[in-house]
Amino acid sequence: MSGRGKQGGKARAKAKTRSSRAGLQFPVGRVHRLLRKGNYSERVGAGAPVYLAAVLEYLTAEILELAGNAARDNKKTRIIPRHLQLAIRNDEELNKLLGRVTIAQGGVLPNIQAVLLPKKTESHHKAKGK
C-alpha cells in the first residue's frame, strides 16, 4: 500500500486545436460541427472542415486587405461597410462571386456616363487662331 499507483503513468499532452494544427485562425471544430448539423451529407470527412475553414479564411483575408486599402485611400483608420463595398465591387473576381450580395450601408460605385460630362470646347481654340 505505497500509494504510488498513478505516479508511473504519462501525463496527458496539452490539447492542440485542429485550427492550430492546420495553421489557421478560423475554427475547424466549429466548421465541422456546422457541416454535421447542416444535413449536407450523412458523413463528413476529417479533411473537409479543414479545407473549408482555410477557404473561408483566405476569402476573408482578401476582402479585409482590399477594404483596408480602400479605408487608407479615404484617410480613415476604421473599415466601414462603404470600404467593403468599394473593395468588392472594384475587384473583378470578388464582384463576380458576390454579385448578388447587397451590403447594408455600402452605397454605390461612383460612375458618371461619358455623355453627361462637360464637353471640351475646341471651337474656342479655333476662334483665337483666326
Curated annotation (Swiss-Prot):
Residues with Phosphoserine modification: 2
Keywords: Acetylation, Chromosome, Citrullination, DNA-binding, Hydroxylation, Isopeptide bond, Methylation, Nucleosome core, Nucleus, Phosphoprotein, Ubl conjugation
N6-glutaryllysine modified-residue sites: 96, 119-120, 126
Entry-annotated residues carrying N6-(beta-hydroxybutyryl)lysine: 10, 14, 37, 96, 119
GO molecular function: DNA binding; protein heterodimerization activity; structural constituent of chromatin
Modified residues (N5-methylglutamine): 105
In-chain residues carrying the UniProt-annotated modification Phosphothreonine: 121
Protein name, as recorded: Histone H2A type 1-B/E
Native organism: Homo sapiens
Source lineage: Eukaryota, Metazoa, Chordata, Craniata, Vertebrata
